[in-house]
Amino acid sequence: MTISQDLFARAQASIPGGVNSPVRAFNGVGGTPLFITKAEGAFTFDADGNRYIDYVGSWGPMIMGHNHPAIKQAVHDAVENGLSYGAPTEAEILMAEKVKELVPSIEKVRMVSSGTEATMSAIRLARGFTGRDKILKFEGCYHGHADSLLVKAGSGALTMGVPNSPGIPEDFAKHTLTVSFNNLDEVKAIFAKYADEIACIIVEPVAGNMNCIPPVPGFLEGLRDVCDEYKSVLIFDEVMTGFRVALGGAQAYYNIKPDLTCLGKVIGGGMPVGAFGGKTEIMDYIAPVGPVYQAGTLSGNPIAMAAGLKSLELLSEPGLHAKLEATSKAICEGFEAGAKKAGIALTTNYAGGMYGFFFTDAEKVTTYKQATECDLERFKRFFHLMLEEGVYLAPSAFEAGFVCAAHNEQEIKDTIAAAERAFAKL
């Protein structure tokens, strides 16, 4: 028995499923999850002493690479003054000012402690601002585990094999309308039917929870136009894409301005941080200046602010995001070439510092339906073959891959060579 196997057995006796977030349990690929003991740069190390080139990156936050010395020092300096105050600090102001600088659509921003809190709060705010109840989301897009958003969600829900979650009252879920991602005609049809009942559209501008699926040309522009026409709030869930697809997020990458933006992952530099922000007229509906209540004991925690601010400062280095996208492109091209050589049908997508690959005959995957129809059994085998090669991919066919600034030429070459050997064994 490996040390990871022993730890997993112990964990299951005290933690539901042995994990504190479902996708970590390896249900999507089978086998025993890796128990990580440390991480450095582009690598993670498990309890059995194995080293892996890491493309999970703590599910997105570690864009500068693991254990970055400058971020670590910023945390150390902040800890010297205390862990949490439950009171305003200058660090919160500096973080808010930095977010506004990098994401111009955000005029005011509220800090929270997770991406789920960010999306949940943004939905409540949109409903309060518009006085409407219904929201529109897309099949396969995951926006955290708030009740109204776990309807035809992607990622963990797909990995579990269920489109929804028990425990959500039907009377509550009925206010969530769902249409196909990348299908503007369905959006227009639902708005024509419900008109002034829809408070907002919430969308991942690049879907990262049915693997990586970018928007088709005109889709995001169309959502902007529909929201303008019906006076609904357009919410970009950039928890995954924020500061990763581009310095200004997917909205900068695709040049579309939402009304509200949800942030998480990268913004915390590895600490638990989320945020939502947008137009002043909407954000001023939040308490204490407005009637929509939102609060959090650890919101704006000084340690988290220090880590996040330093991460955003490092990300502002000229050329860094071009390097990230070049890495994503190289991985995708290498995987496609290796699969073709082995006679295996595979296609890829990428946007900035995130990528995805699909075992399918389709030329491109652009929808949730296509993602669910890919060869999931082949993905499982490939995942374990890559693990044996020392490459740690996301343990689910419905999760995007993440590159980081520490993935250099050697790591890319080693990853592509490992993939070629794995494809040959499939």
Curated annotation (Swiss-Prot):
Any one cellular-component term (Gene Ontology): cytoplasm
PROSITE patterns: AA_TRANSFER_CLASS_3
GO biological process, one term: protoporphyrinogen IX biosynthetic process
E.C. designation(s): 5.4.3.8
Keyword Isomerase among UniProt keywords: yes
Origin: domain of life: Bacteria
Residues where N6-(pyridoxal phosphate)lysine is found: 265
Cofactor(s) the protein requires to work: pyridoxal 5'-phosphate
Entry keyword set: Cytoplasm, Isomerase, Porphyrin biosynthesis, Pyridoxal phosphate
Catalytic activity: (S)-4-amino-5-oxopentanoate = 5-aminolevulinate
Pathway participation: Porphyrin-containing compound metabolism; protoporphyrin-IX biosynthesis; 5-aminolevulinate from L-glutamyl-tRNA(Glu): step 2/2
Gene Ontology terms, MF aspect: glutamate-1-semialdehyde 2,1-aminomutase activity; pyridoxal phosphate binding; transaminase activity
Disulfide bond positions: none
Subcellular location: Cytoplasm
Alphabetized NCBIfam families for the sequence: hemL, PRK00062.1
UniProt family annotation: Belongs to the class-III pyridoxal-phosphate-dependent aminotransferase family. HemL subfamily.
Subunit structure: Homodimer.
Protein name stated in the entry: Glutamate-1-semialdehyde 2,1-aminomutase
Organism in which the protein naturally occurs: Pseudoalteromonas translucida (strain TAC 125)
Gene behind this protein: hemL
